[in-house]
From Swiss-Prot:
HAMAP family: Enolase (MF_00318)
Modified-residue entries (N6-acetyllysine), positions: 60, 71, 89, 92, 126, 193, 199, 202, 228, 233, 256, 281, 335, 343, 406, 420
Protein's name in the database: Alpha-enolase
Organism of derivation: Mus musculus (Mouse)
Catalytic residue list: 210, 343
Amino acid sequence: MSILRIHAREIFDSRGNPTVEVDLYTAKGLFRAAVPSGASTGIYEALELRDNDKTRFMGKGVSQAVEHINKTIAPALVSKKVNVVEQEKIDKLMIEMDGTENKSKFGANAILGVSLAVCKAGAVEKGVPLYRHIADLAGNPEVILPVPAFNVINGGSHAGNKLAMQEFMILPVGASSFREAMRIGAEVYHNLKNVIKEKYGKDATNVGDEGGFAPNILENKEALELLKTAIAKAGYTDQVVIGMDVAASEFYRSGKYDLDFKSPDDPSRYITPDQLADLYKSFVQNYPVVSIEDPFDQDDWGAWQKFTASAGIQVVGDDLTVTNPKRIAKAASEKSCNCLLLKVNQIGSVTESLQACKLAQSNGWGVMVSHRSGETEDTFIADLVVGLCTGQIKTGAPCRSERLAKYNQILRIEEELGSKAKFAGRSFRNPLAK
């Protein structure tokens, strides 16, 4: 079934910034997709086209990206009469029309919006759920429900506190189902709220962009201590482990790292990559930390390689790899990390996201599907993580509707699968291992 009409518009993301939404019509109905947007973005990401017209939305409008869809992409796809199940063909067509390495002509936000809508239409065309259509596109015969990684304490560029490291996450790996993982996550979250309130006062429980708390602490160890306490109070010490997203590129300063980067600059306090690595190792020793994302700057390749070889935990590349096949291939050959963070808007199409995932998995890596800090009510990544069988997803705390929208969709999928539902649990790093 071919595309009858495509219409794009500017809508608002969870931070009040404009983003792209696409309505795609086939004979089967309307299929709608919205594009997310990040705060701490890797410099190697595909280009998110913003208007840069300072008189409108502080320069963050996306009317050009919308216009590229309505005036160029839409007429081309409608006239070509391609069947919506042909995801790769349609994505390729848009990428060729754009003609740039990083999608800077149309904007990755334009191409991705259409790509996501096409994928949703393709599922209905085939008469299968979206996660099953994605599994088919990826060549996966089975599907797996992921362990959620809840970002419950925020720092870095996501928060107004002094904390340098961006995310402290809880992963309920000991749960027996996704529904149970949600319950554990929610209960630990509420216990954490009380722990923070008792220690720092009620105003310390205000939430950040992703629904986590942002108490005004400076020491990263203090965040881990708060998590350890909340997990114990909730009664889940044996079932919950901790993950971190350091986003170290945000505080990289000419070969060193500044763990107090939100204070006035003082080079005397910078630490070396080796000192930072030792700090991480102390975290792993003293807390149930099993996963660290972006521990070093996106170009500090040597530090990544050294750490991954010796840490014995999951080391996740986000700014390092930006869901880009070339960066993933380099990181794989240099053994820089052992897990890919998959963000559809870093690469800008469904097909390339699937390819990035496959490439990472073929190198023996784990893959964690991720939201962005500027999100919408779109739930595509919930179906994506199930269809790709990656076993892990991070899409915020169990708080704020744009985060819960994804988690709730995974709950529905688990219910629909019934007795066939398989939860990744403790095998979240490699759920397909027999």
